[in-house]
């Protein structure tokens, strides 16, 4: 025999129409409907007139309602072990089987029909329980999700904290190492300065010792001559006169010091006290620059008049154009050539030998800058240059161009690029230990930058001297980490 009802539907059929709970001590009325014994007793107590069945409205007699034994057995068979009995209404002694949604209170069936809750919205406790169970499950799911989010957030915070500590430890180590190297360099410069002072002092003292030795010899001869003269003064008249012209005159002449022998010496060191810090700073600055880059020129970018040699490290402007393929990266008007290596981050230093050229330009250019037609020499077009014009005017190519007060004629130009700080500085690099800044561009660099050399026109041979990328000098540099 197949069952037509599910367990929830069966529970609905076993509910008392008054308390809406599973029957407890069910009684069967004459009409055939069943009710809880307590529900019928409470209902009959509150009604003065005859009792009518709440379901079919048929007049019934509660006193002759027998227990519905079969229904009670079915309920007992379906009841789970350990099911707790509902609490009882203090007013009607009926089970608190309903829940008043307005007052948020548990009530019995009579409270909903006859009491203060009769016009309120009431719901069976089981329904409220199921609803709240679902709400609790939803809330629990939200809390678990929030808990997972918080755990994930805590994990990220812990990882972030660990990363910060690790990065701090690494950076602290770098600082200690850098300062250790700086202290070493300062100690070297200190020893160098002291050695210079001591060497200068030794020379001065040696000169004074020689003069002192000469003066002491003269002093001894004078004392000897003085003793001879005193001895002659005790001789007889004849003896004194006889030996006077022979002996004493020669002794006195020999002992007489030459005029102007003593020449005072002043302590004048090559390094003045007020210049110590500046001089040492210049020497240290040269050493803390990045190691010079080893650069080569890119033939694919060279103007047809340019001739490259010595492993693409030397370029000069010739009189005849070279046969070169027309490529997008090649300059077709300006006599320029790029280095094959570009920079998009970090600190870099390189040098260019310009010699005695009367006209030249050098600097950096964006890889995306146009190379066709006349080169637009300005930072607005991605070109940062300085140069020499007609052998007398140094200038920085900005907007507008800026004349540079350069002392002398540098034969070697140093270029220092700090990409992240947006700095491009040019130096007079003729004296390795005394770099002199010529000009600094400030810019927000974007994309890859390439060193650029512009030999300018050969001027019928008068400006045909080459520009050279010298090999980097190995010693004397402190290579600093990029941090």
UniProtKB/Swiss-Prot annotation:
Q: Which UniProt keywords apply?
A: Acetylation, Coiled coil, Cytoplasm, Metal-binding, Transferase, Ubl conjugation, Ubl conjugation pathway, Zinc, Zinc-finger
Q: Where does it live in the cell?
A: Cytoplasm
A single GO BP annotation from the record? Answer: regulation of establishment of protein localization
Q: Which GO terms describe its molecular function?
A: identical protein binding; ubiquitin protein ligase activity; zinc ion binding
Q: Where are the zinc fingers (B box-type)?
A: 84-125
Description of post-translational modifications: Auto-ubiquitinated.
Q: Where are the annotated RING-type zinc-finger regions?
A: 16-57
Q: Where is the B30.2/SPRY domain?
A: 275-474
Record family assignment: Belongs to the TRIM/RBCC family.
Q: What is this protein called?
A: E3 ubiquitin-protein ligase TRIM50
Species per Swiss-Prot/TrEMBL record:
Rattus norvegicus (Rat)
């Amino acid at each position: 025999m197949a069952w037509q009802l599910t367990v929830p539907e069966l529970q609905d059929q076993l509910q008392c129409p008054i308390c809406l709970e599973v029957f407890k001590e069910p009684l069967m009325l004459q009409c055939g409907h069943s009710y809880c014994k307590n529900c019928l007793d409470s209902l009959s107590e509150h009604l003065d007139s005859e009792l009518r069945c709440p379901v079919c409205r048929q007049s019934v007699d509660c006193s002759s309602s027998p227990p519905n034994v079969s229904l009670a057995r079915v309920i007992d068979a379906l009841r789970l072990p350990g099911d707790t009995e509902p609490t009882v209404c203090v007013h009607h002694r009926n089970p608190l089987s309903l829940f008043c949604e307005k007052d948020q209170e548990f009530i019995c069936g009579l409270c909903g029909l006859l009491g203060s809750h009769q016009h309120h919205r009431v719901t069976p406790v089981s329904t409220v329980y199921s609803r709240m169970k679902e709400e609790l499950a939803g809330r629990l799911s939200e809390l678990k999700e929030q808990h997972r989010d918080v755990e994930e957030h805590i994990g990220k915070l812990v990882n972030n904290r660990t990363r910060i500590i690790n990065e701090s430890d690494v950076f602290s180590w770098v600082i200690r190492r850098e300062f250790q190297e700086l202290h070493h360099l300062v100690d070297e410069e200190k020893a160098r300065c002291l050695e210079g002072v001591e060497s200068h002092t030794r020379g001065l003292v040696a000169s004074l010792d020689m003069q002192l030795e000469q003066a002491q010899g003269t002093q001894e001869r004078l004392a000897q001559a003085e003793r001879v003269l005193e001895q002659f003064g005790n001789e007889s008249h004849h003896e004194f006169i006889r030996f006077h012209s022979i002996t004493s005159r020669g002794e006195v002449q020999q002992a007489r010091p030459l005029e102007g022998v003593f020449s005072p010496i002043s302590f004048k060191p090559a390094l003045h006290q007020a210049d110590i810090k500046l001089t040492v700073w210049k020497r240290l600055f040269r050493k803390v620059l990045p190691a010079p880059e080893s650069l080569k020129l890119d033939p694919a970018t060279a103007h047809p008049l340019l001739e490259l040699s010595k492993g693409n490290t030397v370029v000069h402007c010739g009189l005849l154009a070279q046969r070169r393929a027309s490529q997008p990266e090649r300059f077709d008007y300006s006599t320029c050539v790029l280095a094959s290596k570009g920079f998009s981050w970090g600190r870099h230093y390189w040098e260019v030998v310009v010699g005695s050229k009367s006209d030249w330009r050098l600097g950096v250019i964006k890889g995306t800058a146009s190379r066709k037609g006349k080169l637009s020499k300005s930072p607005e077009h991605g070109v940062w240059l300085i140069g020499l014009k007609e052998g007398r005017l140094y200038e920085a190519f900005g907007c507008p161009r800026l004349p540079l007060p350069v002392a002398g004629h540098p034969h070697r130009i140093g270029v220092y690029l700090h990409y992240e700080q947006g700095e491009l500085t040019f130096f007079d690099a003729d004296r390795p230990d005394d770099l002199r800044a010529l000009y600094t561009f400030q810019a927000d660099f974007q994309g890859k930058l390439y060193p650029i050399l512009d030999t300018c026109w050969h001027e019928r041979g008068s400006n045909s001297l080459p520009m050279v990328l010298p090999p980097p000098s190995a010693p004397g540099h402190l290579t600093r980490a990029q941090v």
